Amino acid sequence: MASHVECRPLGVFECELCTLTAPYSYVGQKPPNTQSMVLLEESYVMKDPFTSDKDRFLVLGSCCSLCSRLVCVGPECSLFYSKRFCLPCVRENINAFPQEIRQDLEKRKAPSKRTPSQPGSRT
């Protein structure tokens, strides 16, 4: 019976950028039922719905370390570079990030280009 109590959602996580919503069961750096796992940031966590293993969990998101906006871990909403940053804050402060982060952000923005030889394209 105790295991049912710890799986109950505490609330609903909602990303302020993409509006992803999901029930979360824990907020912090050390999710329940983990032996030595410590997350690098205060995170909103839910039990992994794809497994019956109670030790498995999914990190939904965290607060942006600059603006405190609640954002999911999706690559279109945030990135983690020693701390969580929402992409609007990354873009506003792009020169404060290393070249590798800037290149990664450019790759995210670039539309995928199809060549005529790829399936699904018309010539």
UniProtKB/Swiss-Prot annotation:
Name of encoding gene: CDPF1
Which stretches does the entry tag as region Disordered? 102-123
Query: What protein family does this chain belong to?
Result: Belongs to the CDPF1 family.
Which Pfam families would you find in this protein's record? C6_DPF (PF10170)
Domain of life, per UniProt, equals: Eukaryota
Task: Indicate, by first and last residue, each region the UniProt record lists as having compositional bias (Polar residues).
Answer: 114-123
Its name, as the record gives it, is Cysteine-rich DPF motif domain-containing protein 1
Check the record and name the InterPro entries matching this protein.
Answer: CDPF1 (IPR042426), CDPF1_dom (IPR018785)
